[in-house]
Amino acid sequence: MPAGGGLWRGPRGHRPGHHGGAGLGRLWPAPHHAAAARGAVALALLLLALAAAPPCGAAAVTRAASASPTPGTGATPNDVSAEASLEEIEAFSPGPSEAPDGEYGDLDARTAVRAAATERDRFYVCPPPSGSTVVRLEPEQACPEYSQGRNFTEGIAVLFKENIAPHKFKAHIYYKNVIVTTVWSGSTYAAITNRFTDRVPVPVQEITDVIDRRGKCVSKAEYVRNNHKVTAFDRDENPVEVDLRPSRLNALGTRGWHTTNDTYTKIGAAGFYHTGTSVNCIVEEVEARSVYPYDSFALSTGDIVYMSPFYGLREGAHGEHIGYAPGRFQQVEHYYPIDLDSRLRASESVTRNFLRTPHFTVAWDWAPKTRRVCSLAKWREAEEMTRDETRDGSFRFTSRALGASFVSDVTQLDLQRVHLGDCVLREASEAIDAIYRRRYNSTHVLAGDRPEVYLARGGFVVAFRPLISNELAQLYARELERLGLAGVVGPAAPAAARRARRSPGPAGTPEPPAVNGTGHLRITTGSAEFARLQFTYDHIQAHVNDMLGRIAAAWCELQNKDRTLWSEMSRLNPSAVATAALGQRVSARMLGDVMAISRCVEVRGGVYVQNSMRVPGERGTCYSRPLVTFEHNGTGVIEGQLGDDNELLISRDLIEPCTGNHRRYFKLGSGYVYYEDYNYVRMVEVPETISTRVTLNLTLLEDREFLPLEVYTREELADTGLLDYSEIQRRNQLHALKFYDIDRVVKVDHNVVLLRGIANFFQGLGDVGAAVGKVVLGATGAVISAVGGMVSFLSNPFGALAIGLLVLAGLVAAFLAYRHISRLRRNPMKALYPVTTKTLKEDGVDEGDVDEAKLDQARDMIRYMSIVSALEQQEHKARKKNSGPALLASRVGAMATRRRHYQRLESEDPDAL
């Protein structure tokens, strides 16, 4: 080692530590990763270094710079005090320094720290552990003996699992929605006092003869309630066939048809209760589902049918469960349904089941159970599956693509004992044949005539079909030709021979056929070439398996030994041990036999290191770690010290007596910051140090990610129930929108209702009553129209304004007339001759100017004018009295007096004057 010492660094990302007094010792790493082998090697090197490393010199010599700059020529000037020369530097800008080697003295600390910071080297704040979270070292465990696999067989496999998914099929439900509404009719309003809704089934004959033949439905519903047969008519009218129209809205996977959008409500004469009936024929195509043991099925409407969907009248299906009377079920062969949207008949016939329940009729296509359902479901296909026989007498199936192994007995599974397991061989053969044609058709041959089925642990069923390479198959063929058995055993001989040699015959399988009646056929290999090839293959296989078994056992023993090292190191530096074990930055302290930990928080704000490590105001006292300031989560500037491995301490308690010839290197970011005599000098890059990493030159295996191997997906688990309640709620909320128009408002005209009632009354009187009714209805209609016109005119704002103005004008005229009459009564002369009376009033009247004779004449004239007015009134009364009936009576009386020779007397006496 050179006299100046050497700057040693541990592997990248490891926690450094220092050894020695005033001189600079070696910086050795503590474990950082969780890998047990790497941790053990690092700990062993650390213990050896601490025990055997000699002390180094005080000077740190690097490969890049020949000499260190003197204090005062670096970042801090001599003529500035320690407090004034605190140059805060930021350590977050990545990228190496652009300054050449040897010129670090001309750079400030800010530039050097920026050049050292990288993305991987971040700063952390570690709170002290409180003990709420503890970690224990795993105790030693007994190492298992890994059995070696032997007799490997390559092939293609298909994995099956238990089928938890329900059996789904399409079904049609037919029902008539009967709504009976009772309404109280008022003079200007209508109120619903009762509403009764019921679903009634559609007869099967109507479905087959009307709905599935002409796309129509009868507007009449006949059903049984309270053990009585009742009938309902749509709109209380005679039944007719109504076209089925598509529903307004449909949920996903469902369709619907109905006959009407409206609910009939009868609004009759005012003051009475009226009842109206609405019959809406509805056909819905829904999803039905049934779960094992398939003794009932549920519809997406929420209805449950208590019978097996596989119940039928042929092929033994009558043994399935049914919970209804036989008369409610009907099966129709060669049935041709129609598409209610296009009105097209199906091209192929089906066997359709019909079941009439108290509230609906359900129909679905029947098929045997064995063709529709299976108790096992295909899970995964393994194009490369390896089967090996373990020493405990079991088969181990390993799939590299799946990253999983399945262990089973050597005895094949008898699928006849598996209920509804006929699909396994069929689906497995189809999948294996497809994989073989796509991948192995030119390089391998299939062994056997069908897949071998095994029950693996965990309830999985493995359908395995061995593969033989073409070269090996040719060797088998040559051996058979040599023995003269090629024509006896046929093309399946290579697979049989390979199975007979490599694995014992499974229990319960049929014995091989006898040859010439002398015993069982036993095929052996006699070719030396084949034997050598087989021996070489078996030898290499056994050697590799034995080596892998030893490595596995040694790995387990190494884990137990590493536990002792971890336990001892946890007493020296629990934080480093916990960080390496957990794989994330934590702070730890021992609590007896366990470690209390707290997670370190990454500092995302700026981190600044100060140039001086001397304590201001205290001579002879210095800080043992550099001073830093940083920001964290917007809390402002925090003052602290730089801890080990980029840890930021929130206190400044680490002090020591100042010593001469002080030289220290501290980890900062991805490099090291160098202090001399407690002053910053420069930044030391990682490439300038000597690495203690011992590189192991090996070719590693390819990286492999282990992902969760889901047996049942979330969708499969959510779809296991008999009822899908979310779908039921969605359907119930959508029912009114599908089959009824909720936006349409029917406005009732009470006049029309009155005329309709009068018309119905006269129509009940026959033809004469109908004729009279037309006349009466015409007159009534005219009156209603006139009144309606007036009401409409008055309801118009302009009409109401005009009427108001006319009324106001009449009131003003009446007031003026009343005032004029009052003036006439009070002072007639003033009212008749206002000018004359006004002049007399202004000029005044002297007694000498009045002519008494003219005054008497004026009085006489006024008196005679009054007499003339009275005579005219009497004459007017007389004429009015003699007009009409009075005049007729006077005329008759005059005729009678004339016949009796009476003469009229003079009404005035000529001698009276």
From Swiss-Prot:
Renumbered ranges of motif Internalization motif: 902-905
Predominant localisation class: virion
Disulfide bonds: C126-C600, C143-C556, C217-C281, C374-C423, C622-C658
Side Intravirion, residues: 819-913
Stretches in topological domain Virion surface: 60-797
One Pfam family from the record: Glycoprot_B_PH2
Subunit structure: Homotrimer; disulfide-linked. Binds to heparan sulfate proteoglycans. Interacts with gH/gL heterodimer.
Family: Belongs to the herpesviridae glycoprotein B family.
Protein name, UniProt field: Envelope glycoprotein B
